[in-house]
């Protein structure tokens, strides 16, 4: 397979997205809400979990693929991909805890993990663009 890290990450996150989508549908059926959140806080929360995953995943997968195509170190990419996924899983866990009136700590850790992973990937790509493409 040409892009094994990107492919594995995409597959795992696709399954996670299906799970989150199921949670949204289940809540829609429960509250008989076809569109929006219908003034239901739990619906807001499950929709937020789903949409947040979709907001961060595409650009991360693109960056992983670009780095894999540039023959970047697969082990380092795998570590970053796992960190990103942990961040996304922690975000959902944190959203559920926050909705239950508990601390936002897990959401904060999730966002720092997600953003840090994305910044590292972006800087790595910029570094390769400058050093490999512009200076050679």
Outline where the language-model segments fall.
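N-terminal signal-anchor transmembrane alpha helix
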Residues: 1-31
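Membrane-embedded alpha-helical transmembrane segments of multi-pass integral membrane proteins
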Residues: 13-16, 20, 83, 87-94, ...
